């Protein structure tokens, strides 16, 4: 317990008092490169604590990344796995099949990937099957 007491009562106050924090707004522009380097560690600690607090107290932040890996957002959601069988003999000349899961005409592509590509910067397109 004594080492913790020493850090809290002596080391930390000495460190914080030695930081080059200017008295005025204009003083920030007069800091040297060495002074800016000395300010990096406490800034990183404060930013880390702020981010950790944000994650702890903002429910939307905790579940923001959970749904991002899902590509199918609407097609046959009641099934465990979406599988569609199409016989090659049933294809007249060629058929374009959706790969982006945005189509309203599943499993065929209706061009919905174009809007998806514009919004996300993606480059997804259909799978085109041709009859020989």
Curated annotation (Swiss-Prot):
Cofactor(s) needed: [2Fe-2S] cluster
GO cellular component: endoplasmic reticulum membrane; mitochondrial outer membrane
Cofactor annotation remark: Binds 1 [2Fe-2S] cluster.
UniProt: [2Fe-2S] cluster binding residues: 98, 100, 109, 113
Pfam family, one: MitoNEET_N
Topology versus the membrane: Single-pass membrane protein
Cytoplasmic topological domain residue ranges: 59-132
Sequence intervals crossing the membrane: 36-58
Subcellular location: Endoplasmic reticulum membrane
Keywords recorded for this protein, A-Z: 2Fe-2S, Endoplasmic reticulum, Iron, Iron-sulfur, Membrane, Metal-binding, Transmembrane, Transmembrane helix
InterPro entries hit by this protein: CISD1/2 (IPR045131), FeS-contain_CDGSH-typ (IPR018967), FeS-contain_mitoNEET_N (IPR019610), MitoNEET_CISD (IPR042216)
Entry-linked Gene3D superfamilies: CDGSH iron-sulfur domain, mitoNEET-type
Ranges of the Lumenal topological domain: 1-35
Keyword Magnesium set for record: no
Biological process, per Gene Ontology: intracellular iron ion homeostasis; mitochondrial transport; regulation of autophagy
GO molecular function terms attached to this record: 2 iron, 2 sulfur cluster binding; metal ion binding
Similarity section: Belongs to the CISD protein family. CISD2 subfamily.
Protein name: CDGSH iron-sulfur domain-containing protein 2 homolog
Species of origin: Drosophila persimilis (Fruit fly)
Gene that produces this protein: Cisd2
């Amino acid at each position: 317990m004594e080492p913790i007491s020493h850090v809290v009562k002596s080391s930390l106050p000495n460190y914080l008092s030695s930081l080059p924090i200017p008295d005025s707004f204009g003083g920030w522009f007069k800091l040297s490169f060495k002074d800016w380097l000395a300010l990096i560690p406490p800034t990183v600690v404060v930013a880390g604590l702020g981010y950790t607090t944000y994650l702890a107290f903002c429910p939307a932040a905790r579940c923001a990344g959970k749904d991002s890996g899902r590509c199918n957002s609407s097609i046959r959601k009641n099934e465990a796995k979406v599988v569609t069988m199409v016989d090659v003999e049933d294809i007249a000349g060629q058929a374009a099949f959706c790969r982006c899961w945005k189509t309203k005409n599943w499993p065929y592509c209706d061009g919905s990937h174009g809007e998806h590509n514009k919004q996300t910067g993606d480059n997804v397109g259909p799978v085109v099957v041709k009859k020989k």
